[in-house]
Amino acid sequence: MCAMILKNPDKNSEFANFFTKMTACFGDFSLFEQQINEIATVAGIDLSQFMIDHLAVRMNSVEKAEQWRIMLLVQSELLKESEVNGRPIGLFTLLQPLNFLNQQVDVIELPFPKGKTYPQEGWEHIEIVVPFLADETIEQWIARLIKQFQLDQNERLKVKISQPKVEGERLANPSIAISLKDETNQNNCCLKFHPYDIKLIVRSES
């Protein structure tokens, strides 16, 4: 069982117990930090300069997804649950934020599985916010980030661009995902860029 002590322990013993259960399900939190930091270092990204708006997990069975959903709701509120590409994806706002790489992050994304088998279940990626410039199109935003971080020239990175469309969302939410090509080090995590804080995207729907 994977567990760790809360980085910012307080008198909320219920949340501390929840955190222990969460890391037992999702995996070693400090290892997740190390893996994300490794990707950022390879890509030349200073994460302290960007907002980390949410963390995400992955699993290989609907049964596990349902168990994790129940577990999260013990110490979080459901921010939103949407159908994306034929599967439900839930966003949960924790009652107490997690300290992730010196940032306070309180949203966890939990998507139900859809056929793909992940080599490792649990913590999978983070998303950082890189806002659009004035009058910038999606294509220009993508091109700017690829050029800024030289993503197309870094032989150690895999790059995936996507534009998921969620019913009701009014703000465009393209993403650029980067991960390490060399998986011999067991780093199966991913770092994603997108232009809006996920909470702003949700608020824009109402």
Predicted regions and their residues:
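Glyoxalase I/VOC metalloenzyme domain signal
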Residues: 2-53, 57-87, 92-206
